[in-house]
Amino acid sequence: MTIFRPHLRFLFKPHFLYFQSPAGQSSRPFSTSQILRTALDMPPPPVDTTQRLAKLRELMAQNKVDVYSMQFRYTIKAPLIITVVYSFFFFLLLALKLCLRKTAISQSTLLHVMGVETLIRITAAFISSFTGSAGCAIVSMSKAALSTDGRYFSQAAKQLDSNWTLLKRGVEGVPTWEEWTAEQAENGKVVGVDPSLITAGENLHYTPLTSVVVTNCSYVIADARKLSQTLKTTGGSLVGIDQNLIDAVWGNERPARPANQITVQPVERAGKPFEEKVEDLRKELAAKKRSAMVISTLDEIAWLFNLRGSDIPYNPVFFSYAIVTPSVAELYVDESKLSPEARKHLEGKVVLKPYDSIFQASKVLAESKASASSGSSGKFLLSNKASWSLSLALGGEQNVVEVRSPITDAKAIKNEVELEGFRKCHIRDGAALIEYFAWLENALIKEGAQLDEVDGADKLFEIRKKYDLFVGNSFDTISSTGANGATIHYKPEKSTCAVIDPKAMYLCDSGGQYLDGTTDTTRTLHFGEPTEFQKKAYALVLKGHISIDNAIFPKGTTGYAIDSFARQHLWKEGLDYLHGTGHGVGSFLYAEVPLSASNVLSNEPGYYEDGNFGIRLENLVICKEVQTAHKFGDKPFLGFESITLVPFCQKLLDASLLTEAERKWVNDYHARVWEKTSPFFEKDELTTAWLKRETQPI
């Protein structure tokens, strides 16, 4: 989806996608995926939000709340990936979040940071009708505003009704959501945050309030600090609120946390025994002279212990915490979820503790400090993405050192087994996409079938299921025709999606989770006769894609520098796109990673013309060290190995718009696509013919 920006798309620290029922009351189990999909069946936007806003303001007045602000960022892909899944549960959630007494900002940097973000987005969608994956909704007694970034300008403009003002993030002259909130909360008003839903790194003054607020959305790390500083300029302040009303309001209707089974990621696919990973972490603790690390990031826990779950849609993680000391590794998880294989995997090596006991255990850890014999400073290591409440349980600043998690860095560097898994799964996934595109063209052109965007996405899933080691999609498929392709994180819904027009551009962004790796591929096709401008725009995007693929740069180069390689050709024509050129990808996990050898990243420049079409060309690449004639400063140089194997659209390829070197790149790439994928279609004449045509030299 969207490379090279130090951001948030896939590094996700989720926490509770569930709420427990009070003691003595039954809990209703639920399927996370089912809930996510149910929520997507919302009325066609825009929705008239007048009554909802009136009710919100009524509750705000009753509770003496001047401003209600809710920042959200989902983290899965597809419009988003997490970009991707969107709404549901609004009514109960909404009601709750309104019961505040002070100015309230609802965030989503939860304890784990991802699960509840989904619920927040649901609430945000309900109050604003905007279903995008990132933004901030702010409501005062007389105004309502929605701030979002360039990926969602088009979508927000379509979904917001006249009650709302769209704050286009990054556009000159448009206030940030923090500035807009400060304007509404001036003259001594208070903005409240739930300490379990904000990162520990904020070091905000903790002032418990009798009435609460908040909920979640991710990555408020810098935002909370910035908001706090901004509020001070108008006399406002930001405080921690001790209680969360969601549990109280939801009552018996609150769903239980997922009880999906946890399985083992065998060392043949993980590439390294979990015992060695734990020992590596202990060495890191010793080097930093820390007595323990408390881990709350779900993908880090799954990676560390070579375990996989399915508590978060499209992401093989499970709700848990972990504590690693020089002598003990503890996993806080619902034991009933562990498969017999997983129990045996951990037996005698990891101490299992109840999931809900993590805060009490953290308090005990803080009280005991580190043993004198350990030689440590007695402080505990905590990720700077962990919740403020977890930091407080460990004793706060005097006991905790908040840093970039060493596990994040360790898992970002894929080992050879993981890299080989990526290469192999991309061959199979490439074959699946080739089969799909061949089928789609035949159905539309030869058979004259009427297929909508969801029909296409469903067929692709059906095809992928036939290929070895397929687990499921890695995000909701973006199947978009014509103008819908211009909505960067478009999510087709059966009730409102368009019929695929063979005379228009078709953009398909999809990915699969395989036992040996994760895929993410975008191709833009045309089944009829594209315009000259469409072919030119396609060539400009392809040139940028090739520039990234051919890039060679010294180790330590920032992503921003490389991002410009992809945009340069569009810039020369006065064109651009409003998303990053790529993102990091996990190994049957999710992760946003910096540029380093053995990282797996996406290369996906694009161009979008509102109301007309969108173009995006995405391959996954492995960052690797390359040989150069010289090594300036004795630094190694890095480059990329493209592992995606799907041809580019011949009807959109105009060889005259490419240089000789670019044409050679395309021909070499297509030759490799044919070599690797054609054996899958020895008995499939339709797909073989399509693949042969699409990979012919230009």
From Swiss-Prot:
BP-aspect Gene Ontology terms: proteolysis
UniProt-listed InterPro entries: Creatin/AminoP/Spt16_N, Creatinase/aminopeptidase-like, Creatinase_N, Pept_M24, Pept_M24B, Peptidase_M24_C, X-Pro_aminopeptidase_P
GO CC annotations on file: cytoplasm
Reaction equation(s) it catalyzes: Release of any N-terminal amino acid, including proline, that is linked to proline, even from a dipeptide or tripeptide
Keyword annotations from UniProtKB, A to Z: Aminopeptidase, Hydrolase, Manganese, Metal-binding, Metalloprotease, Protease
Record-listed E.C. numbers: 3.4.11.9
Residues reported in the UniProt entry to bind Mn(2+) 2: D509, D520, E618
Residues the record lists as binding Mn(2+) 1: D520, E604, E618
Superkingdom of this protein's organism: Eukaryota
GO molecular-function terms, A-Z: metal ion binding; metalloaminopeptidase activity
Cofactor(s), names only, from the UniProt record: Mn(2+)
Cofactor binding, note field: Binds 2 manganese ions per subunit.
Family according to the record: Belongs to the peptidase M24B family.
Function, in words: Catalyzes the removal of a penultimate prolyl residue from the N-termini of peptides.
Name of the protein in its database record: Probable Xaa-Pro aminopeptidase P
Originating species: Trichophyton verrucosum (strain HKI 0517)
Gene for this chain: AMPP
